[in-house]
Amino acid sequence: QYVVNIQHGILDVLRKTGYELVVHPCDRKSDTFIEDARRFIEVQKLYGVILTPSVSEDERLAEVMRELGCAYIRIASIALDMERRMIVTNDRTGGREAARHLAKLGHKRIAVLVGRRSFRSSHERRAGFEEGLAEYGISLPAEYVLQGDYTFESGLALGSQILDLDPAPTAVFASNDEMAAGVLQALH
């Protein structure tokens, strides 16, 4: 949903410009990922590319853009490129604010669903969350940090793990909406 929302925003802007949005799904796990992206850009003769997470984090892809002379913007949790080529999200701040909110509500035992370690957003959200908890003197035990992969299915699976935690958490912080929806279904 995150990327779809970005696409809707881009479409709103492009309607006034005469440019079109071309969406090309990428499989970062593929051995031919970089070559496939290069070929697509060359064949389509793209004016510019907006790289969304997690492909935006791949420096090899940014290098291909520079080699081809293709304008690009990277959306990521931290600055990975020149300022004019970056949109930096506030993942750490969002995690911190979520922790503060839950702490103000009186929660001290909070389960945290994180995304893949390879995703910078997952690291930033967790770091911010832990910083927010620390402001209230709350620690995050390792057994309350559950590894997912930003999918509904992983949230569903982690929901059953949450039910096995003893003592049970009084709140859950999911690192993205898909895992949150999955854990909500599992806990209901």
Residue locations for each model-derived region?
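A short, glycine/small-residue-rich beta-strand->loop->alpha-helix junction that serves as a flexible
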Residues: Y2
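Short beta->alpha connector loops
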Residues: D27-D31, T52-E57, E178
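Glycine-rich, highly charged phosphate/nucleotide-binding loops
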Residues: S30-D36, R96
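Intrinsically disordered, low-complexity polar regions and short flexible loop motifs
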Residues: V49
